């Protein structure tokens, strides 16, 4: 009877210790010893990964990066619920590190095999919360979210149509296109803290969003598993038509006042016309961020290059298209080995077949050097190079 009582007591204590560690009241990496009736009992903080999760060793990441780089990782884990994400981080051991948190792989360049654990979200759902708020699992396809919004008369995301990737990445990269950014829609981000397993909720302001940047990309990099994102849309449709060649494309179709559905289709067609299909040509979309320069620097360059495209940020800053500068350096359609610059859009670097991540990095650095030499401007990758 004493043995059974001790066993039950031990189970209760283990549960209490587990709660303490989840709540941050005990170190999740330190084991605990409990003495019951003179016997020491070891309570580790190690949890087995749920049986329905994907947990693979020496796994090829070829299906998980649109650049088409055939790199392997030591361990690959895909979780499908918040609870599974918590189980994963609680089960991590020292030899599971370093970690790579992977979304759709559409903004990733792998420079070689990854000697650590890749964590991928399989949390895929969409939920209408009412009051123009929509919540999506981090593994939900971004363009499916945009399509849902347009079909349900929820506005603000239509200019972000057909951007590849998943909703979790929108909160990390602050994805943007045609005058719109994810930060304009994001209300709250839910994430599991890797160090503790705690579920955290971050308001938009907490994430410190700026052009293609967030705290998840820097200070919080590899510290959280994003599990869902809540977006705030609008019932009022206010089309943004003055970025890129949207108006020209609408005029070709005889459309003056497009519906959200028409605008989404036009933007989809524009992007498909100038960006390669990663199923045919490996790429990660726009490789470089468009640099923001001072007004004085812009005026200096505008005097040298008539008709130089630009977008006003504020009274003191202008954005200059990196693709235009790369084109001016003569790189469009050119290649270095098996890595090249897409012939229809100089902002896109491509895998011409058999390129390694190092091949793409070499091309990237060569282009950066040439742009700096010609324009005196540094351009930086938008793509996550790992």
Give residue ranges: language-model regions.
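Short hydrophobic targeting helices and cationic amphipathic motifs
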Residues: 9, 30-31, 41-42
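Extreme N-terminal basic, low-complexity initiation segments
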Residues: 2-12
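Short, Lys/Arg-enriched N-terminal segments with co-localized hydrophobic residues
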Residues: 38-52
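Anion-binding (especially nucleotide phosphate/pyrophosphate-binding) glycine-rich loop
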Residues: 54-195
């Amino acid at each position: 009877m004493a043995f059974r009582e001790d066993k039950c007591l031990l189970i209760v204590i283990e549960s209490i210790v587990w709660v303490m560690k989840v709540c941050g009241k005990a170190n999740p990496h330190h084991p605990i010893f409990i003495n019951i009736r003179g016997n020491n009992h070891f309570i580790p903080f190690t949890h087995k990964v749920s049986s329905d999760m994907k947990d693979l060793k020496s796994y090829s990441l070829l299906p998980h990066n649109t650049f088409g780089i055939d790199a392997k990782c030591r361990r690959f884990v895909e979780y499908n619920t918040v609870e599974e994400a918590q189980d994963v981080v609680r089960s991590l051991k020292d030899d599971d590190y370093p970690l790579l948190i992977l979304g759709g792989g559409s903004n990733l360049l792998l420079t070689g095999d990854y000697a650590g654990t890749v964590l991928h979200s399989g949390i895929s759902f969409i939920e209408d919360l009412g009051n123009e708020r929509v919540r999506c699992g981090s593994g939900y396809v971004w363009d499916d979210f945009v399509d849902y919004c347009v079909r349900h008369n929820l506005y603000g995301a239509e200019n972000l149509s057909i951007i590849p990737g998943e909703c979790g990445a929108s909160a990390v990269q602050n994805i943007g296109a045609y005058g719109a950014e994810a930060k304009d829609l994001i209300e709250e981000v839910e994430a599991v803290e890797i160090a503790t397993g705690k579920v955290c909720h971050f308001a938009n302001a907490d994430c410190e969003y700026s052009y293609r940047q967030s705290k998840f990309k820097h200070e919080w990099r590899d510290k959280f598993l994003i599990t869902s994102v809540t977006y705030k849309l609008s019932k009022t449709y206010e089309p943004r038509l003055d970025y890129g060649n949207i108006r020209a494309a609408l005029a070709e179709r005889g459309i003056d006042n497009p519906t959200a559905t028409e605008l989404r289709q036009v933007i989809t067609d524009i992007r498909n016309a100038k960006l390669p299909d990663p199923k045919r040509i490996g790429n990660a979309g726009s490789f470089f961020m468009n640099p923001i320069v001072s007004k004085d620097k812009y005026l200096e360059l505008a005097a040298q290059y008539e008709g130089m495209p630009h977008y006003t940020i504020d009274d003191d800053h202008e954005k200059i298209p990196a693709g235009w500068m790369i084109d001016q350096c003569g790189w469009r359609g050119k290649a270095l080995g098996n890595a090249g610059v897409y012939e229809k859009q100089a902002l896109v670097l491509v895998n011409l077949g058999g390129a390694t991540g190092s091949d793409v990095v070499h091309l990237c650095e060569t282009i950066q050097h040439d742009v700096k030499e010609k324009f005196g401007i540094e351009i930086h990758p938008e793509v996550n190079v790992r």
